[in-house]
A protein has these predicted regions:
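Sequence termini and other peripheral, non-core segments
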Residues: 1-16, 22-25, 29-33, 43, ...
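Conserved, mostly hydrophobic/aromatic
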Residues: 40
């Protein structure tokens, strides 16, 4: 499971669909609707919030908006109605760590996306996040 800090625009089609499915799974976990994945490290920043379901729902909206922009049809009725009204702080080094991880994936599976984005030094974050100074998060498996 990977709940990307980077903006969904950087994901190739396969990555965008995977992000959608994994975030839907995360929503299910955060609602308590499944017993698996409850301790997955990618969920830590969502679980730390007062209303984790609202936060993951807002995360899903960002993915769905990118999908719609590309002409994809993701079933947005699967997104919980709660919304997180603020922007979640995430660190610059977490964003850059994930950027490197994504670039490696794109180099292997979607060279055209890699070529399009490889010159970007600091990517935009997912709309849910605002970037603050800091290290890679402890929950990240490096």
């Amino acid at each position: 499971m990977r709940l990307w800090t980077v903006h969904p625009r950087y994901l190739d089609p396969r990555g965008l669909v995977a992000a959608w499915r994994e975030a839907l799974l995360a929503q299910k976990v955060l609602k308590g609707a499944t017993t698996g994945y409850r301790h997955h490290p990618q969920l830590a920043r969502f679980q730390a919030q007062d209303d984790p379901v609202a936060v993951i729902a807002t995360f899903l909206v960002g993915i769905a908006e990118e999908a719609q922009h590309r002409g994809y049809r993701f079933d947005t009725t699967k997104i919980s109605p709660q919304r997180f009204r603020a922007r979640l702080p995430e660190t610059n080094e977490q964003l850059l760590y994930e950027w490197g991880h994504l670039m490696a994936k794109l180099r292997a599976r979607a060279p055209q996306f890699h070529r399009q984005f490889h010159g970007i030094m600091t990517p935009e974050p997912h709309p849910l996040f605002r970037i603050v100074s800091g290290k890679v998060r402890e929950w990240e498996r490096t």
